[in-house]
Amino acid sequence: VDEAVEERLGAPMRTLVVGRDPRLAATAREEAERLLRLDEGIVTLGASQPLDSATASAIHDARTRGAVVVELSADLSAVSRRENLGVPRSVGLGAPRAVLTQLMRQARVAYEAVADTTVDTSVLTPQEVADEVARACKLTPDY
């Protein structure tokens, strides 16, 4: 979805988020709905997208048409490491780990309602994650 949003809005996702582009939420919802209507392929949603009721409904519709929904998760330690939240920062920036913890809880609840399975990526390599997703989706006879 991010790539479709970037293409449509003509800017990198980081710029759109940091700049709080007012078109971002609606465009992300529209692109998620459009991509989830396709009959084949892999759609990668942002972690918070199932929190949007229209997107959650589109995910449910895709599941009724046979789509498999796989949530990719990671523990707080892994996400903090990946996002460099362990580096020193100004006290004025607040508590990013606390904010992240709350966001992760919200996303987890939303995904519980729509995901068929969850792959914990905390200690897996990208190839291992791909293998687990392929296995969950039964994409090849090997799985």
Regions found by a protein language model. Give the residues of each.
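A glycine- and Lys/Arg-enriched "phosphate-lid" helix/loop adjacent to the NTP-binding pocket
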Residues: 64-110
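NTP-dependent small-molecule kinase module
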Residues: 68, 108-143
